[in-house]
Amino acid sequence: RQCLIKSTNGTMKEIHGHIKDSADIIKNKDIEKHIHLKCLENGIYNIKTGEFSESFSSEYIILNQIPHRFDESCTFDGCQKIFCSILPEKQQRQKFFDFLSTCLHPYTGIDFQLGVLGPPGTGKTQLGKFAEKILGEDNVSHATIHRIAMDPTLQIGIAYQMLNIDGDLSPEDIEQLDVLKKWISQEKFTNRKIYNYAENFRPTTRLMFMANDLYEITNENDAEAIYERTDILKAEQKFRGTQKEIKNIFEDVATESELDGLVTHILKNSTILYQKQKTTYPLDPRHVKGIWNRFGNWIRQFIDNRTVEGASLQIETRLLFEAWENYAITHSCPAKTKNEFYKLFEDITGHQRTRTREDTLSKWVYKGMRLLDEKEIEAAGQAKLKEVDDC
């Protein structure tokens, strides 16, 4: 050990080369060959066939052990009650279980990230903690999506986990779209490791994030790419600071028996997903877009509902920001500074501020658009109501 600590980079390369020449190296194809086999405390579950066996072969290449038992006699009624309190809708609970099932079985083509959206104190963090308890602490990482996208060394370090939880989604997380798309789809990466060796890998790690609010996606193509690869659960029941609050809510009910029953359920569910090649409730990008527009794309909604474009039109930036402030108050949108608003507005519309002169006054304007007046806003609202009625 002391020799390794004092060794130089060249020495470590020699050691690495010696190990590579004298030992069998596990390759990606070896991992993928046995990826459907899940190692538990009491045996192996084959997701493809739905069969459980207490025997284990040394030929299996399995990177993760689930720290629970496969036991069809166990139930998880206590945990289910808590799930029902955080996610009252059956469809949302099933989506959560389906996502955990995909964490157990990568490379199936059933690829998406899961977000849990809701105000503070609604149990989002508890869902993340419980996902970690189900899959096992050693199989779950907690890096931000932004860091995963930017740090190749971190990518290799967490590539073969079952799940990564980003506990607080940030605007930077949704900017790294190229890496995010590849990671969610579990495509091949090539990154340089320490000692200058490049490594090819396909991540098995699914992504999960928590958010109080979503963020503005300024590019329409980027937005569609995220909608197609994301499902969102909504946690809306407030617990923190109320009589319903229970600290570490899962601790008392998450007994070994309950966890065994839940893991057994999720494993069997993963077999169903594999056989059907889809989740119970397939991802609907239009639904995700609707949620994102409501909880994130506020400025885009303002532009769509309060402005109109035209080559000969222009609007003074000061009046535009005042209109946004009124819109934000009316629709309970998060506040933005002038600079934040102008940057997002320009990214979305492609318009740039220009200085113009009117009589003796100089002012900043956006050319090519104007604000709607009150009658136009009312008429547009009536037209949308008619569209809903027609549907």
Q: Which stretches of residues belong to each language-model region?
A:
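N-terminal nucleic-acid engagement/recognition segments and initiation subdomains in replication
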Residues: R1-K81, S85, I156, E172, ...
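Positively charged interface segments
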Residues: Q2, N9, L135-D138, H142-T153, ...
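Short coil/turn segments at secondary-structure boundaries
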Residues: I15-H18, K29-C39, Q94-F99, F112-G115, ...
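P-loop NTPase catalytic core of nucleic-acid-dependent motor ATPases
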Residues: I31-E32, K38-Y160, D231-K234, I266, ...
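Alpha-helical scaffold elements adjacent to nucleotide-binding pockets in ATP/GTP-utilizing enzyme cores
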Residues: L127-F130, Q161, E175-W183, A225-R229, ...
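Conserved nucleotide-sensing/catalytic segment adjacent to the nucleotide-binding pocket
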Residues: L154-N196
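Structural recognition of the conserved hydrophobic beta-strand(s) that form the central parallel beta-sheet
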Residues: I165-D166, T205-N212
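Phosphate-handling catalytic cores of nucleic-acid transaction enzymes
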Residues: E256-W298
